[in-house]
Amino acid sequence: MTGVLPSQTVSRPGCVDQMRRTPDVRHDQTVTLPQIRPFDAGALYQALDARRAELGLSWSGVASQIWQLSADLNDRRRDHPISPSTLTGMADKPRTSCQHALFMLRWLGRSPESFLAGGPEDDARFALPAAGPDRRLRWALKLLYASMDEKRRQDGLTWPALAALLECSPSQLTGLRTAKFATGMDLAMRIVQWLGRPAADFVYPARW
């Protein structure tokens, strides 16, 4: 799958807009940067709320339906279910973890890319993997880190330089190497856009 989003070109030397320069790249070349769009958690909340109203559910009912998508896995693991407040909290603070976002997207039948601000409409190129009741969709964070680090080295970027491009801190990026559970969905989506790959390349049906 190669669902690549639009890009922008930065010429050097003599670029007028210094904010669009890529740090730590040789000055005698043209660098093409992907157009990196933020993940709109507010729009995700609105989509959840619209479907909730359509089905006549309370937020507790939505959380229950989301959790029951992995009913067989839940019976085996006895994990703590997703809380309704995890869903409703996005109304006031429009952000969510990358793993929780997958639970919500699975229930909606939507792709992560369909919630990029000003991004593409939902498209089969970006479809998430199928998962049965014995699986839960999860981000493969180690694979995401390895792919990011490989491209960073190829592009000759330091961690601070890449962090500047992705509008985050270097530790947020390097921390993915040992992350046990999740990072923010916005950061995960910024990384996959920079890689020029669909989020689905880094999502798998997990047994946890």
Residue ranges and their predicted role:
Residues 81-86, 92-106, 180-193:
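Short, basic-rich loop-to-helix N-cap that marks the start of a DNA-contacting helix
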Residues 98-102, 106-126, 196-208:
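Short C-terminal boundary/hinge segments that cap the last helix of small helical domains
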Residues 56-88, 153-175:
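Short alpha-helical DNA-recognition segment
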Residues 67, 92, 178-180, 207:
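Residue-level detection of the helix-turn-helix DNA-binding "recognition helix"
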Residues 1-9, 15:
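N-terminal acidic, proline/glycine-rich, low-complexity intrinsically disordered segments
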Residues 11-72, 122-156, 200, 204:
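A short, Lys/Arg-rich alpha-helix, primarily the initiator
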